[in-house]
Amino acid sequence: MRSAAAALHRLPARALIFLIELYRTYVSPTRMPVCRFTPTCSEYAVTALRTRGLVVGLGLTAVRLAKCAPWHPGGWDPVPQRRPRRRDAAAADAAMSAPHACKGSPHAVVGDTNDGST
């Protein structure tokens, strides 16, 4: 049941990707290459929709298309990586800052008495 709901949730993004693929297959080859970005705007849109979903993917694609103007130099502009969720980031920070004692390791906490002697 859950997989059916997930498939329905992804359906609008998949439909949009299908339309972009039609453009890339039938329209784009008839035109001169004009995209000043790498990856191209259509590749960017497909990647954004696949990795970030419909709402965020459309937002990222709209920002990318807005950059397609004479005043923007273009160049390498990949889909940004996802930021860790707040809970995940807090857990990672806590794990990194938690005191730990590795016997005889340079990672041992200052003032730690876990030197192997009893």
Curated annotation (Swiss-Prot):
Superkingdom assignment: Bacteria
Residues annotated as signal peptide: none
Annotated disulfide bonds: none
Places the protein is found: Cell membrane
UniProt KW keywords: Cell membrane, Membrane
Keyword Membrane: yes
Location of the region described as Disordered in the Swiss-Prot/TrEMBL record: 76-118
InterPro entries associated with the record: Membr_insert_effic_factor_YidD
GO cellular component: plasma membrane
Low complexity bias locations: 91-101
Membrane topology: Peripheral membrane protein
Family the entry assigns: Belongs to the UPF0161 family.
Function recorded in the entry: Could be involved in insertion of integral membrane proteins into the membrane.
Name of this protein: Putative membrane protein insertion efficiency factor
Native organism: Nocardia farcinica (strain IFM 10152)
Lineage, broadest ranks: Bacteria, Bacillati, Actinomycetota, Actinomycetes, Mycobacteriales
